[in-house]
């Protein structure tokens, strides 16, 4: 197959395989728009307009996943654009939540709404707080009041989740220590507010290391008195208590992880890419066991579901939209770039086409599908 890109944007053709093992041809194209303030509100109420970056200003395709910090140990900025197929359109928001008017506040709402052909397809609200913690008292763990703050990055590190690690010996320190306990929250190992029961049982007489849910605590501890709490939660599902989970076994497969997750107190709230190895995304990958290795390798397992390639939270996945998708952000952009914290814009009605030219000379135009919208 010969591929020619005649658009002033970056595009690429590549081959992939479907579940039965058939070769499929994929074309990926990236269009990036710069948000610019509108001179005045139009009839649709848009505060900003989208300006296409093309030619020398066009942004290249992302060839690999990019992270906010250390690879595999921090939130994903954006994933590779070379997904073989996405059954739905991911709507992702990489943002910092700002307190109204830039004035420090203990908590405030943030909201994302998306409209496809005038129909609202996403309405997601978050509650954002300043730094807060669970403190240990004679009646158990209590959630403290948040400190006022101006801004909080909307990342999984600030949401519900966590990691519980305990070293075998007092001398063990850091990631290289031998671990007696090494458990993660299957829905978000980067977060806070989740601990495995054995962490609290054993950390009073062992060395506590590299625990994201207790990242402010030093090595050997006689007592744990404070654990950071989530700063981002669903607007209608407030977090009120420390989630002490129990993982009765290690080395669980994806199905077993899903069963354990059903007993968690809540789910992480966020707007960005869900980790490939997290529940519920992992469950779509399929079963990679000895049977697969003997009968299917290197192809997908028979239970592979292409929804695995959709990286947005489930409530941010929509049907492939029509041109002209509109979106609104509340308290998710710098106040000086908004109208009282509010921002609204719409994508231009651009349509990307692939013209298939067969050996016979016949040309068949195919309209490309919008499978990812990243608001950054």
Can you say where each PLM-predicted feature lies in the sequence?
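Extended intrinsically disordered or low-complexity segments
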Residues: 2-376
């Amino acid at each position: 197959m010969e591929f020619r890109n005649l658009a002033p944007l970056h595009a690429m053709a590549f081959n992939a395989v479907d579940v039965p093992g058939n070769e499929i041809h994929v074309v990926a194209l990236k269009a990036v728009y710069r948000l610019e303030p509108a001179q005045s509100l139009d009839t649709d109420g848009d505060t900003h307009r989208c300006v296409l970056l093309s030619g020398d200003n066009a942004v290249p395709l992302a060839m690999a996943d990019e992270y906010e910090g250390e690879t595999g140990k921090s939130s994903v900025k954006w994933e590779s654009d070379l997904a073989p197929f996405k059954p739905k359109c991911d709507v992702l928001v990489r943002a910092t939540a700002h307190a109204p008017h830039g004035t420090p506040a203990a908590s405030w709402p943030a909201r994302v709404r998306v409209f496809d052909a005038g129909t609202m397809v996403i309405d997601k609200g978050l509650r954002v707080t300043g730094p807060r913690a669970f403190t240990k008292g004679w009646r158990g763990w209590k959630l403290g009041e948040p400190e006022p703050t101006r801004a909080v990055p909307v990342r999984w590190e600030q949401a519900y989740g966590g990691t519980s690690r305990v070293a075998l010996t007092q001398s063990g320190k850091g990631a290289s220590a031998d671990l007696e306990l090494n458990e993660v929250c299957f829905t978000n190992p980067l977060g806070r507010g989740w601990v495995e029961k054995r962490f609290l049982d054993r950390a009073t007489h062992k060395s506590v290391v590299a625990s994201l849910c207790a990242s402010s605590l030093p090595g050997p501890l006689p007592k744990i008195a404070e654990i950071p709490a989530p700063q981002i939660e669903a607007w209608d599902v407030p977090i009120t208590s420390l989630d002490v989970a129990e993982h009765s076994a290690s080395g669980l497969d994806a199905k077993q992880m899903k069963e354990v997750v059903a007993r968690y107190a809540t789910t992480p709230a966020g707007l960005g890419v869900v980790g490939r190895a997290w529940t519920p995304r992992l469950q779509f990958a399929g079963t990679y066991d000895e049977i697969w290795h003997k009968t299917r390798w290197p192809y997908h397992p028979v239970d592979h579901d292409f929804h695995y390639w959709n990286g947005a939270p489930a409530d941010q996945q929509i049907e492939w939209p029509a041109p002209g998708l509109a979106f609104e952000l509340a308290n998710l952009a710098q106040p000086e770039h908004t109208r009282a914290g509010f921002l609204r814009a719409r994508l231009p009605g651009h349509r990307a086409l692939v013209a298939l030219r067969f050996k016979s000379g016949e040309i068949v135009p195919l309209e490309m599908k919008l499978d990812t919208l990243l608001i950054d």
